């Protein structure tokens, strides 16, 4: 076995080399691989720069090969050296700057909800070259290209009808975009200077089309107001004249200067240079901006006319005007004048005697007046209590019936001359249910030393009006 030569089928043996399975188709040569790499580089640069690069051949569609198992001889054959294309020195920097610029532009613009444009391949791109897009470089280039595409913004919808007052807003858009405008100042009105109006609106924020509310384009507030006339300056009484009115403009000029400084400070804070001098424009309605008629001159005190006192305004002058007082009657000589206070309106009303209600009673053909009935409630439920002892008074009778919730009053009738009890009294209730319970439970109970007898009170039947009404009814019926 030691003198045996190499086995047949190995390199160096005299026998033929037995090819392995699938070795009938040769592998890719170095030129084919070089062409594939050049095609991949050209595709990458076209994806990044968006145009074919001159001097580099386009990609050649590769022939799909069947994967083979390399043999030992094929593995030992040295491969041809691969020649890579030379890239210019500034190519990487130019591509990097382009990518950074497009990424910055894409970061400031919010892409719309609509999908991006479809992908279009380079010239000469065939279906067989789609396998080259699976590489990480191609995917990154495709992602950067899609991010760098500027999104399409939806057009701004304008209303079909715009009032003539708002049509001037379109002309003011150019001035609004150029820089900040001076704020419109509120004119002084009746010696009052209002605060400055809010500054002009800044540039619109980068929002998607659906984020802003629909409406007319933004414009200046001053362009929306019609031009009005300047209102009259505030007037103040002069020092030396005293009988006329004099215009005073120093306060108005000082207020306007202060407002101009405030508007300039706001304009500088907003980022723009301060514009020209502020223009005072009327911001009040036409009815309020019209000049008011001059008031009539009022008679002034002598001190103001002579210049001893400072000038006064109209409200102060009205308070200083003497009010006419009624002349006091002078008392006769030798007597002192005494001030008698006049009675007030309430005292006059109280002094009038109110019409008292008279309670006229009638029974057994006689009539009399009983003012004690005014102490009782006219809408109560009253019980007559008879057979009372001499020791029973109002407190004892009230203590006996006070256990009922709606108990109002109890009274024992006495003789006016002697003060002795007449042997009966009355108890009043507000609730009819308590009235019925008292009639049922307290009848025959001892109050003092005697049992009392209860019955319904007939006090209403003895009123003169009720008696006459009943008599008329009886006459109509023919009973009497």
Swiss-Prot record:
Residues 1-30, 319-356 are annotated as: Disordered. Keywords: Acetylation, Cytoplasm, Methylation, Nucleus, Phosphoprotein, RNA-binding. It comes from the Eukaryota. Residues 345-356 have a biased composition (Basic and acidic residues). Residues 381-459 form the RRM domain. Residues 11-27 have a biased composition (Gly residues). InterPro entries: Nucleotide-bd_a/b_plait_sf, RBD_domain_sf, RBM42_RBP45_47-like, RBM42_RRM, RRM_dom. The modification N-acetylalanine is found at residue 2. GO terms for biological process: mRNA splicing, via spliceosome; negative regulation of mRNA splicing, via spliceosome. Pfam families: RRM_1. GO terms for cellular component: cytoplasm; nucleoplasm; nucleus; U4/U6 x U5 tri-snRNP complex. Binds (via the RRM domain) to the 3'-untranslated region (UTR) of CDKN1A mRNA. Interacts with HNRNPK. Belongs to the RRM RBM42 family. This is RNA-binding protein 42. It comes from Homo sapiens (Human).
């Amino acid at each position: 076995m030691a003198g045996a030569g190499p086995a047949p089928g190995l390199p160096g043996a005299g026998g033929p080399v037995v090819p392995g399975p699938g070795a009938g188709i040769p592998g890719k040569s170095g030129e084919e691989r070089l062409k594939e790499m050049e095609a991949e580089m050209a595709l990458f640069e076209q994806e990044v720069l968006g145009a074919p690069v001159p001097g580099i051949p386009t990609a050649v569609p590769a022939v799909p090969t069947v994967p083979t198992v390399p043999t030992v001889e094929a593995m030992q054959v040295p491969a041809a050296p691969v020649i890579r294309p030379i890239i210019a020195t500034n190519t990487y920097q130019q591509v990097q700057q382009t990518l950074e610029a497009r990424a910055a532009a894409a970061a400031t613009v919010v892409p719309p909800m609509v999908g991006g444009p479809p992908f279009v391949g380079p010239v000469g791109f065939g279906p067989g070259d789609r396998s080259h897009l699976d590489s990480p470089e191609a995917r990154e280039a495709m992602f950067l290209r899609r991010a760098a595409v500027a999104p399409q913004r939806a057009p701004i919808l304008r209303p079909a009808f715009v009032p003539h007052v708002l049509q001037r807003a379109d002309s003011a858009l150019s001035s609004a975009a150029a820089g900040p405008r001076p704020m419109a100042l509120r004119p002084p009105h009746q010696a009052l200077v209002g605060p400055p109006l809010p500054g002009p609106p800044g540039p619109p924020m980068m929002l998607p089309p659906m984020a802003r509310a629909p409406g007319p384009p933004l414009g200046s507030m001053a362009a929306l107001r019609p031009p009005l006339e300047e209102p009259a300056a505030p007037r103040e009484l002069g020092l030396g004249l005293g009988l006329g009115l004099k215009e005073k403009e120093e306060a108005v000029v000082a207020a306007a200067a202060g407002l101009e400084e405030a508007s300039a400070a706001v304009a500088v804070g907003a980022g723009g240079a301060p514009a020209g001098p502020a223009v005072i424009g009327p911001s009040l309605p036409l009815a309020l901006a019209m000049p008011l008629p001059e008031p009539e001159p009022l008679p002034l005190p002598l001190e103001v006319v002579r210049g001893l006192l400072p000038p006064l305004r109209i409200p102060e002058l009205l308070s200083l005007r003497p009010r006419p007082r009624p002349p006091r009657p002078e008392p006769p000589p030798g007597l002192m004048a005494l001030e008698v206070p006049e009675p007030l309106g309430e005292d006059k009303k109280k002094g009038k005697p109110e019409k008292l209600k008279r309670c006229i009673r009638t029974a057994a053909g006689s009539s009399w007046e009983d003012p004690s009935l005014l102490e009782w409630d006219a809408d109560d439920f009253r019980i007559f209590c008879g057979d009372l002892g001499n020791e029973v008074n109002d407190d004892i009778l009230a203590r006996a019936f006070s256990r009922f919730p709606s108990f109002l009053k109890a009274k024992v009738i006495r003789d006016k001359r002697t003060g002795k009890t007449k042997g009966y009294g009355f108890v009043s209730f507000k609730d009819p249910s308590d009235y019925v319970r008292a009639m049922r439970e307290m009848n025959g109970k001892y109050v003092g030393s005697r049992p009392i007898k209860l019955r319904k009170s007939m006090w209403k039947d003895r009123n003169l009006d009720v008696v006459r009404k009943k008599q008329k009814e009886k006459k109509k019926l023919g009973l009497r």
